[in-house]
């Protein structure tokens, strides 16, 4: 397989679906969007490939308050949230927060402990999976678990739904 084979063999006869018909490093379309869209102060759309700090990301000022970064992954026991209610799958593949042994030791967490995972968006109680298979400073929770929280009470999730911890804020694009 060769990506863009026809374009590579004859770019004149097989233009790409860009304004110039070519691979664009500078995007006229993104430049126009950046000039015409109403963006929040911390939202950036750049016509050139450029690093832009993400919100809720590694360099967010809230990191001083919440030092561990949380990431989600597709879990082997579910397809998104489908099959999240199947008992045998829940037993075979329990919902856990992955944490590096260095971070776990600093917090007095042992494998299997129920831990409180929280940030400014929400909180959950979930079992800890202490493993060197995740980097120090990073935690991970499989996505797709069903929410089990009293949303009219304490709002603490007991099902391991990563969505309780996200801002639900879309990126500018």
Q: Residue spans of the language-model regions?
A:
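Long, contiguous, secondary-structure-rich segments that constitute the structural scaffold
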Residues: 81-83, 87-98, 102-173
């Amino acid at each position: 397989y060769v990506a863009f084979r026809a374009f590579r063999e004859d770019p004149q006869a097989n233009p790409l679906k860009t304004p110039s018909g070519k691979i664009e490093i500078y995007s006229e379309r993104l430049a126009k969007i950046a000039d015409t869209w109403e963006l929040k102060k911390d939202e950036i759309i750049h016509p050139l490939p450029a690093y832009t700090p993400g919100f809720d990301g590694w360099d967010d000022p809230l990191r001083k308050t919440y030092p561990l970064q949380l990431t989600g992954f597709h879990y082997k026991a579910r397809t998104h949230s489908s099959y999240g209610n199947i008992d045998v799958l829940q037993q075979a593949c329990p919902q856990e927060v992955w944490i590096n042994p260095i971070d776990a030791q600093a917090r007095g967490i042992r494998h299997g402990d129920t831990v409180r995972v929280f940030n400014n968006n929400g909180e959950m109680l979930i079992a800890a999976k202490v493993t060197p298979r995740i980097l120090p400073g990073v935690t991970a929770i499989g996505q797709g678990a069903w929410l089990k929280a009293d949303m009219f009470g304490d709002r603490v999730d007991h099902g391991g739904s990563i969505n309780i911890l996200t801002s639900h804020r879309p990126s500018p694009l």
